Swiss-Prot record:
Enzyme class: hydrolase
Organism per entry: Cereibacter sphaeroides (strain KD131 / KCTC 12085) (Rhodobacter sphaeroides)
Coiled coil: none
Sequence intervals crossing the membrane: none
Compartment(s) where it occurs, according to its Swiss-Prot or TrEMBL record: Cell inner membrane
EC numbers for this chain: 3.6.5.n1
Record bears the keyword Cell inner membrane: yes
Biological role: Required for accurate and efficient protein synthesis under certain stress conditions. May act as a fidelity factor of the translation reaction, by catalyzing a one-codon backward translocation of tRNAs on improperly translocated ribosomes. Back-translocation proceeds from a post-translocation (POST) complex to a pre-translocation (PRE) complex, thus giving elongation factor G a second chance to translocate the tRNAs correctly. Binds to ribosomes in a GTP-dependent manner.
Membrane association type: Peripheral membrane protein
Gene Ontology biological process: positive regulation of translation
A GO CC term attached to the entry: plasma membrane
Protein name per UniProt: Elongation factor 4
Main location: membrane
GO molecular function, one term: translation elongation factor activity
Length: 602
């Protein structure tokens, strides 16, 4: 069983990179070269355990591996790598992982250069006080321009890149230099073994056999198997059943000391009981104050998830419960919709989080789902001085009682090649954006915009990719709430409001959004035996209308010649029947119509 390691032989680090710049591949090579995993067990993206992580090529949960590295100076070092998510939705997970380590490898694709996400994550690493080693990956590509990218790192980020490590993670070129750079250029952790235990909860996940597995970084003191520990935010106390380090499989260990990263199990039933960023200490003689910077995860984007087949509702509920075991930032509550039946209103950290959860529900639990239009949380200030949070546009209170509405704003950073800059600026202006900054790094422009989150959650990312042919990269932080003139737009089909299609829009854009929506629905809803009006309305005022004409049966076909009043009588009878039908008829809106209507270009 491995023993505790002395501080100056430990190096804790994370890898910072934009999607597809080779972060997980580099982690694979480091693991392979040091023999941490046997060759026969090696597979691509070994740290990405979810199938969806491998398929999308993204990292969602923070994962860790402990590598024993015999360095050239004759000493064996323990390297703890935390593989962090790169995507903005998981920014809080990134910030916690960053605080658990002392240094970062900044991986930049030598052919593509610095991207928006690289910037966001580097700033987090600098905030956490990291030593950063730049690594240029993919230098064996014909398009690689290491010198240009080095100067870009210096210009855009302000890091000295003169001694950047040049590698190709795919072929393994330069990997030994990375290991030496980790040992000699990153600092060892600090900590006091004699002090009371203070450990940070970096991540947690649910295991069917062990219950909740908690990943910790020990700051001070020593933690041993059998200790009784307390979570400082929740006050819960647990006895430790098992302590281990991850290589990536669990290897049991008797104790963990300062600077070490490992996992523990303690018969914890739910991931919700373990909050990322919490401080763990001993039940008796614990530390006085928790580690700073803890904040509970707040959902930002909400949408309804409904089963296509109403009989799948129970299966969906079970799947949600299982997912929530493993994802504390995902919230859900039951809701009913006249159009879609029973389902759930779910809260997510962002759009990627929404897509990942939906994909996992569909793939791992084999469910067919309808997603309603994503919406954000609005703050509604009432005239009586109270504040309401609005998660679902259907619950909008009567406007006569509302003083004003505030919506969340974001600071978006977009990196884009020069030739597409005009299209990007136009897109941001169309989305009610306010330009804050524009700077150049070589042939790429970096634009910073203040945008309403509501305009981004719908299809901003897809539009951005299409106007820039996929070359733009985008990252955002939520900056706060601001008052704006927002209204609830309802869609009525045959004079019945369809709750699943109602949305919050800015007053200036309501007419355009309403017109586009009713035109789209006119194409999507099949014709019935009676005519169907489709209307977009704000309060009692209709702002757009289309009518689907009725199917017509030729009732006069059997009249040959003769009196015109005979035909008239038949036509009047048909007209009366249609009128009655329209009063009592139910309009069937196909599921596909919902899905397509919600995907519309705005």
């Amino acid at each position: 069983m491995p023993r505790m390691t002395q501080l100056d032989l430990i190096r804790n680090f994370s890898i910072v990179a934009h999607i597809d710049h080779g972060k997980s591949t580099l982690a694979d090579r480091l693991i392979q070269l040091t023999g941490t995993v046997a060759e026969r067990d090696m597979k691509a993206q070994i740290l990405d355990s979810m199938e969806i992580e491998r398929e999308r090529g993204i990292t969602i949960k923070a994962n860790t591996v402990r590598i024993d590295y015999p360095a050239k100076d004759g000493r064996t070092y323990v390297l703890n790598l935390i593989d962090t998510p790169g995507h903005v939705d998981f920014a809080y997970e990134v910030s916690r992982s960053m605080r658990a380590v002392e240094g970062s490898l900044l991986v930049v694709d030598a052919s593509q250069g610095v991207e928006a996400q690289t910037l966001a994550n580097v700033y987090q690493a600098l905030d956490a006080g990291h030593e950063i080693v730049p690594v240029l990956n993919k230098i064996d590509l014909p398009a690689a321009e290491p010198e240009r990218v080095k100067s870009q790192i210096e210009d855009v980020i302000g890091l000295d890149a003169s001694d950047a490590v040049l590698i190709s993670a795919k072929s393994g070129l330069g990997i030994p230099d990375v290991l030496e750079a980790i040992v000699h250029r990153l600092p060892p952790p600090k900590g006091d073994r004699e002090a009371p235990l203070k450990a940070m909860l970096v991540d947690s996940w649910y295991d069917a056999y062990l219950g909740v597995v908690v990943m910790i970084r020990v700051m001070d003191g020593v933690i041993r198997k059998g200790d009784r520990v307390k979570m400082m935010q929740t006050g819960a106390v647990y006895g430790i059943d098992r302590l281990a380090v991850l290589k990536p499989q669990m290897v049991d260990i008797a104790e963990l000391g300062p600077g070490e990263i490992g996992v523990l199990t303690a018969s914890i039933k739910q991931v919700r009981d373990t909050r990322v960023g919490d401080t763990i200490t001993h039940e008796k003689k614990g530390c006085a104050a928790p580690l700073p910077g803890f904040k509970p995860a707040q959902p930002v984007v909400f949408c309804g998830l409904f089963p296509v087949d109403a009989n799948d509702f129970e299966a969906l509920r079970e799947a949600m419960e299982k997912l929530a075991l493993n994802d504390a930032s995902f919230t859900y509550e039951m809701e009913t919709s006249a159009a879609l039946g029973f389902g759930f209103r779910c809260g997510f950290l962002g759009l990627l989080h929404l897509e990942v959860v939906r994909d996992r529900l569909e793939r791992e639990y084999d469910l067919d789902l309808i997603t309603t239009a994503p919406s954000v949380v609005y703050q509604i200030y009432m005239k009586d001085g109270t504040l309401q949070e609005l998660h679902n546009p259907t619950d909008m209170p009567d406007l006569t009682y509302v003083d004003h509405i505030e919506e969340p704003r974001i600071r978006a950073t977009i990196m884009v090649p020069d030739e597409y800059l005009g299209d990007v600026l136009k897109l941001c202006q169309d989305r009610r954006g306010i330009q804050l900054d524009l700077s150049y790094a070589g042939a790429r422009a970096m634009v910073v915009y203040d945008l309403p989150l509501n305009e981004v959650v719908f299809d901003f990312y897809d539009r951005l990719k299409s106007v820039t042919k996929g070359y733009a990269s985008f990252d955002y932080q939520i900056t706060g709430y601001r008052e704006d003139f927002l209204v609830k737009m309802s869609i009525l089909v045959n004079d019945e409001p369809v709750d699943a299609l109602s949305m919050m829009v800015h007053r200036d854009r309501a007419d355009m959004r309403g017109r586009a929506m009713v035109e789209k629905l006119k194409e999507l809803i099949p014709r019935h035996m009676f005519k169907i009006p489709i209307q977009a309305a704000i309060g009692g005022r209709v702002i757009a209308r289309e009518t689907i004409s009725a199917m017509r049966k030729d009732v006069t076909a059997k009249c040959y010649g003769g009196d015109a009043t005979r035909k008239r009588k038949l036509l009047d009878k048909q007209k009366a029947g249609k009128k009655k039908m329209r009063q009592f008829g139910k309009v069937e809106i196909p599921q596909q119509a919902f899905i397509n209507a919600l995907k519309m270009d705005s």
